Amino acid sequence: MILYPAIDLKDGNCVRLLRGDMEAATVFGTDPAAQARAFRDAGAEWLHLVDLNGAFAGKPVNAAAVEAILAAIDLPVQLGGGIRDMATIEGWLDRGLARVILGTVAVEQPELVREAAMAFPGKIAVGIDARGGRVATRGWAEETDVNVVDLAHRFEDAGVAAIIYTDIDRDGAMAGPNIAATEALARAVNVPVIASGGVSSMQDLMALRATGVIAGAISGRALYDGAIDLNAALKALA
């Protein structure tokens, strides 16, 4: 199981939100590239980035910070937030991203996800953000009546690289991930599922791995708070 350290970008800074609330942002650093280097130096294999402003704006906002990170490290990087058309997808991949995450458009323009996955094999992930089993979009500001598993099934044959499942109510709350829901999703689809939201301890990581079906886990606040030691966690998961 791959551990993805997360850098959430708001106004050019590294932040963490509580349950997706932009007003409840805690700034953990003002130099995203330095944070990326710190994660690399601790042994990270991947990096997970979110353009929070972009998720609300519907277009890239923290491009300068993302580009600084890409210039600072040579790890594969995945990015979500405000990526809603083919030109933006192509632009980010051209700039060196290993993978782009499509969330809102997976609900609103599923054919774009299919087209992108066909054009860029292995480089497109679907981000499914949910509250109470229902999908939320546009920076989690809009809730839909779309069921998580139903949405995931729509992309099983599309060739997407992964599904990143975020339980919004757990995100940034340090309350533990929704292991049951994540495992159920992973067992329901034939696409690798990455857990996000609430991963707050080594025990959480081990419990996710123990399911045998979850491909990865994303953690942000727990790494910044020191609740998880990245180097020790990577060794334990190796």
From Swiss-Prot:
Pfam families: His_biosynth
UniProt pathway annotation: Amino-acid biosynthesis; L-histidine biosynthesis; L-histidine from 5-phospho-alpha-D-ribose 1-diphosphate: step 4/9
Active-site residue numbers: D8 (proton acceptor), D129 (proton donor)
Highest taxon in the source lineage: Bacteria
EC class name: isomerase
Name of the protein this chain belongs to: 1-(5-phosphoribosyl)-5-[(5-phosphoribosylamino)methylideneamino] imidazole-4-carboxamide isomerase
EC numbers, comma separated: 5.3.1.16
Transmembrane segments annotated in the record for this chain: none
Presence of the UniProt keyword Transmembrane in the record: no
Lineage start: Bacteria, Pseudomonadati, Pseudomonadota, Alphaproteobacteria, Rhodobacterales
GO CC entries: cytoplasm
Biological process according to GO: L-histidine biosynthetic process; L-tryptophan biosynthetic process
PANTHER family, alphabetized: 1-(5-PHOSPHORIBOSYL)-5-[(5-PHOSPHORIBOSYLAMINO)METHYLIDENEAMINO] IMIDAZOLE-4-CARBOXAMIDE ISOMERASE (PTHR43090:SF2)
Keyword Translocase attached: no
Catalytic activity line of the entry: 1-(5-phospho-beta-D-ribosyl)-5-[(5-phospho-beta-D-ribosylamino)methylideneamino]imidazole-4-carboxamide = 5-[(5-phospho-1-deoxy-D-ribulos-1-ylimino)methylamino]-1-(5-phospho-beta-D-ribosyl)imidazole-4-carboxamide
Source species of the chain: Paracoccus denitrificans (strain Pd 1222)
Principal place of residence: cytoplasm
Family matches, as InterPro entries: Aldolase_TIM (IPR013785), His_biosynth (IPR006062), HisA_bact_arch (IPR006063), Isoase_HisA-like (IPR044524), Isoase_HisA-like_bact (IPR023016), RibuloseP-bd_barrel (IPR011060)
Gene Ontology MF term list: 1-(5-phosphoribosyl)-5-[(5-phosphoribosylamino)methylideneamino]imidazole-4-carboxamide isomerase activity
Family, as annotated: Belongs to the HisA/HisF family.
Keyword field: Amino-acid biosynthesis, Cytoplasm, Histidine biosynthesis, Isomerase
